[in-house]
């Protein structure tokens, strides 16, 4: 196996991450986050609202506790994919020599969004475990159910902060395509809107993440192809 040239990395450090590797990581993370999140919803299935009477919740979890717990596990996997996507964006911002504050904001927002996702996944896991037990207090079950069925402010704010960082990365640092930055701005605001609009915004965020990952993958390839074609034309012209 060929070894890297020592002169290429004179300081003996790890070779820098290539734009192609960043694009692949972003695509895997973004698309994986979308697929795993939707799969979690499909596994859990129709979920009772937060105002469901306790008696109905007891019968619901007695019949569906296994799929709720499995859905929580799949949701945890989506959080891992989101971390991969956030790392790719962070690396892209660093390569663009943008402000360290912007790169730090992207990492903080990624960590917050991942933590809130894992907390939600853990809540579904607890519901799946206690739902199978006999004699569970209905009021306690309802309290856990409300935590799982009603999105928290922490979820919305972490997504808002992440999208705000993405907007800055595209507009200020030009580390991301401009269309991603401009669409991130209104989508960030919608994350803080309550009720159905906020829920719709959370679904759009899943699609936005997958589209961003694919854009970072193929957009970089297109620019590399353009530079290669330009270099070939210059060589032919000077031949």
Language model features: what each stretch is:
Residues 2-239:
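Hydrophobic, aromatic-enriched alpha-helical segments typical of multi-pass transmembrane helices
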């Amino acid at each position: 196996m060929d070894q890297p040239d020592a002169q290429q990395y004179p300081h003996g450090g790890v070779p820098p991450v290539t734009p192609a590797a960043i694009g692949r990581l972003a695509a895997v993370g973004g698309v994986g986050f979308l697929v795993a999140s939707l799969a979690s919803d499909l596994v859990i299935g129709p979920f009772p609202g937060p105002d469901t009477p306790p008696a109905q919740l007891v019968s619901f979890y007695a019949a569906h506790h296994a799929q709720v717990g499995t859905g929580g596990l799949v949701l945890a996997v989506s959080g891992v994919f989101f971390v991969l996507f956030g790392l790719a964006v962070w690396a892209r911002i660093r390569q663009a020599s943008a402000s360290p504050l912007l790169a730090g904001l992207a990492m903080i927002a990624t960590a917050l969004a991942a933590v809130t996702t894992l907390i939600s996944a853990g809540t579904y896991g607890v519901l799946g475990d206690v739902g199978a037990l006999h004699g569970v207090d209905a009021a306690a079950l309802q309290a856990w159910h409300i935590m799982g069925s009603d999105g928290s402010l922490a979820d919305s704010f972490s997504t808002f902060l992440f999208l705000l960082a993405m907007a800055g990365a595209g507009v200020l640092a030009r580390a991301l395509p401009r269309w991603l930055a401009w669409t991130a701005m209104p989508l960030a605001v919608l994350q803080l809107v309550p009720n159905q609009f906020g829920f719709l915004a959370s679904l759009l965020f899943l699609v936005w993440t997958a589209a961003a990952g694919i854009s970072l993958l193929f957009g970089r390839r297109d620019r590399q192809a353009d530079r290669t074609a330009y270099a070939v034309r210059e060589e032919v012209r000077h031949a």
